[in-house]
Amino acid sequence: FDKACKVVQIDIDATEFDKHRNTDVNLLCDAKKGVSALIEGLYGYKDMHADWNKTYSEYRKRCKCKTDIDLKPIVPQKIIYEINRLIDKNDDMIVTTDVGQNQMWAMHYLHVHRPRQFLSSGSFGTMGFGLPSAIGAKAAKPDNTVITITGDGGFQMVQQELATSVAEDLPVI
């Protein structure tokens, strides 16, 4: 954890406070009530990342990486290029990734237009995240097209979830 961050622990059992990590604030309450109170407290909070977000947005506009690369065999950038073409035609599309290089390609090259359009486990290293998260996204947004970008290892860990996708009528690509 970043030493500068403040850690809040919400629990219904006070004996759990500071058990695994020292916290700055302990809230003895139901999680729903505690999170609701925290959210309410954030209203009017100044976005401390506004300057960075503006700089990053300008950087992205200037630094367009070439992804329309026609090589044989096909290269990862070309796959992301084709997915971007689909996203540009279908703004409701949701993309999930597994971990590994496929995740890095997506994070570097994917055009994300809105919040919750790109779902990834980030740096948590959860191999096998891609397909189950795609199925979950489809369950939450059944009218949206959902695709996952995964590798052989991640797919092999959760390939049985294709049966879940079919059984629950939650088609994903």
How should each PLM-predicted stretch be described?
Residues 9, 95-97, 148:
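Structural beta-sheet core signal
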